[in-house]
Amino acid sequence: MFFDTKVLNYPTIHKSISMASTMQRTSSSAASNERQLSQLQRRAPSLMIKPTSFSNWNVAIPLLSPLAPSLTSSFDQSHVPPPQNKTEIPVEEEVKKTPVFKKWQHPASPFCYEPTTFVPPFIQV
């Protein structure tokens, strides 16, 4: 069998040409990577936002501020019944309930603990 040398050498020549061009691209791309701009540098934001200084903020944050009682209320108090007299308190509520003091318990702790049986340890000590 006779092989044509051009056919046999073609892939190696093609590889060497492509390797050389790839190396040229790599070396040129390494130099151009230093000069390339990032996406933010290439396209600047459309709106420039300047933060305001905190000394200019004179408005209280409503949810974090204490509630100031206002003298003029928007709530119509004409429909509110007058407070009841203390003489009308039922007899059951007259008995003072003594507060029950318990030891503090973590909310996630179990209500009761079941007794455990002795289990030998996995590792012999």
UniProtKB/Swiss-Prot annotation:
The keyword Transit peptide applies. This is Uncharacterized protein At4g14450, chloroplastic. GO terms for cellular component: chloroplast; cytoplasm; nucleus. It comes from Arabidopsis thaliana (Mouse-ear cress). Keywords: Chloroplast, Plastid, Transit peptide. It is found in: Plastid, Chloroplast. InterPro entries: At4g14450-like (IPR040381). The keyword Transit peptide applies. It comes from the Eukaryota. Transmembrane segments: none annotated. Residues 1-46 form a transit peptide.
